[in-house]
Regions:
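Active-site rim beta-loop-alpha module in soluble metabolic enzymes
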Residues: 159-232
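Metabolite-binding pocket within alpha/beta catalytic cores that recognizes anionic/polar moieties
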Residues: 2-178
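Glycine-rich beta-alpha junction loops
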Residues: 122, 139, 201-208, 246, ...
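Structural signal for hydrophobic packing residues in well-ordered secondary-structure cores
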Residues: 48-52, 94-97, 101, 190-194, ...
Length: 292
């Protein structure tokens, strides 16, 4: 028997759109590009086929454009910053795809979306230069979001987590990190010879949670040295960003394909940054659109 989702759990706006994103089921493509910055949606849409835009929707930090690129139907959606927003976005995308809004029940045939986050990141290994494109084969969530869902351990790599917490001298008062993998088929399709691959930390903040120190000291001043030196079964941690773990983890729980690819705009280990990174991101966007 299909579950029924009451109005308190699934909030549908008067116009038939989902609560936060404000888009309707028919406006969502199977292929979805996720970007953090609402302004980047227009950059992605600038590559779409002429006169192919089906909808432009804006609600809070969430902007959506659906159109086609070389005949492929694609939605580009901005998420804002952080895994808390990702919890909203991925749940609402899944609801749009797999819940019948008229009956408030799960559809008999479930739809699997392709979710690709295009973002920016800070590199943690000196051999990955500024401007590189870096795919997160594994995402390490410092945020704790996945622990609120049943099935967390079944989709996570527990041995990796245990080794990481021991190596980082993990603060027991912090949420335990979770480690999840990107969809292998999607990674193989997009991460070709022009991209690096690695394991990415999704931090739940930009400053202290990524080892940055301004006026407040941090709990573990050696955290980034420990991150750089960590190795597990041939894997190393390559970069920081702030959304990918929740995208990958929730997609695994819901039956969607997901991955994150970022342009490296800061090199934490050599204390360098590139503020003129937009041309690199534009090239990354076009590359992903060709391969998704």
């Amino acid at each position: 028997m299909n579950r029924h989702f009451p109005p308190s759990e699934l909030i549908i706006n008067e116009d038939g759109s989902i609560f936060h994103l404000h888009i309707k089921p028919e406006q969502l493509a199977d292929k979805v590009i996720l970007v953090g910055d609402p302004g980047r949606v227009d950059m992605v849409a600038s590559f779409f086929d002429e006169d192919s835009i089906e909808c432009r929707v804006e609600s809070r930090e969430f902007r959506t454009v659906t159109g086609t690129y070389k005949g492929k139907r694609i939605s580009c959606i901005s998420t804002g910053i952080g895994t808390d927003n990702i919890d909203i976005v991925v749940n609402e995308l899944d609801a749009l795809a797999n819940i019948d809004f008229a009956t408030r029940t799960e559809k008999s045939e479930l739809r699997s979306l392709e979710l690709v986050r295009i973002g920016t990141c800070g590199g943690m290994q000196a051999d990955i230069p500024l401007g590189s494109f870096l795919v997160s084969e594994k995402s390490i969530g410092f945020d704790g979001v996945l622990a609120f869902y049943a099935g967390r351990d079944e989709v996570s790599e527990l041995g990796f987590e245990e080794a990481l917490m021991k190596h980082l001298k993990w603060n027991p008062k912090a949420a335990s990190p979770y480690v999840v993998s990107a969809n292998k088929e999607l990674v193989e399709r997009i991460a070709q010879e022009d991209m690096y691959r690695g394991c990415t930390i999704s931090a739940n903040g930009f400053y202290g949670p990524q080892g940055r120190v301004l006026r407040c000291d941090i709990h573990n001043p050696e955290i980034n040295d420990l991150i750089e030196s960590f190795r597990y079964e041939g894997h190393r941690i390559t970069n920081y960003e702030m959304e990918g773990s929740a995208i990958a983890g929730l997609a695994l729980l819901m039956g969607h394909k997901a991955m994150t690819v970022c342009c490296v705009i800061a090199q934490r280990r050599i204390e360098a940054a590139n503020t003129d990174y937009k041309p690199f991101v534009k090239k990354l966007v076009e590359t992903v659109l060709d391969r998704i």
